[in-house]
Amino acid sequence: MAKKSMIERDKKRENLMNKYLVKRQQLKTRLNETDSVEEKLLLNQELQKLPRNSAPSRVRIRCWLTGRPRGNYRDFGVSRHVLREMAHQGLLPGVTKSSW
């Protein structure tokens, strides 16, 4: 189980990301469309003024059950440990133990 403070920090980052998502996308599209160097510098400065934690790369994907930050399966949203236990219990439809 992950520390509660780390889980809450990630929730805060996700809220910030959602808050500034539209503004960040608008700035990035304008940055890619312009040709002048001066305007690119101004747009880049505006982009840097946004909060650091509002960047999507700062949000960590965590297991929704345990909060584990590593070894997550995106399709299920759980870590490898939880995935294994849920598969053994038959809680994941369509997942079977492989044998050959």
From Swiss-Prot:
Protein name: Small ribosomal subunit protein uS14c
Function per UniProt: Binds 16S rRNA, required for the assembly of 30S particles.
Record flagged with keyword Oxidoreductase: no
Cleaved signal peptide residues: none
Keyword check for Nucleotidyltransferase: no
Protein family membership: Belongs to the universal ribosomal protein uS14 family.
The species this protein was found in: Cyanophora paradoxa
Annotated compartments: Plastid, Cyanelle
Keywords: Cyanelle, Plastid, Ribonucleoprotein, Ribosomal protein, RNA-binding, rRNA-binding
An example Gene Ontology biological process: translation
Known partners and oligomeric status: Part of the 30S ribosomal subunit.
Molecular function via GO: rRNA binding; structural constituent of ribosome
A Gene Ontology term for the protein's cellular component: small ribosomal subunit
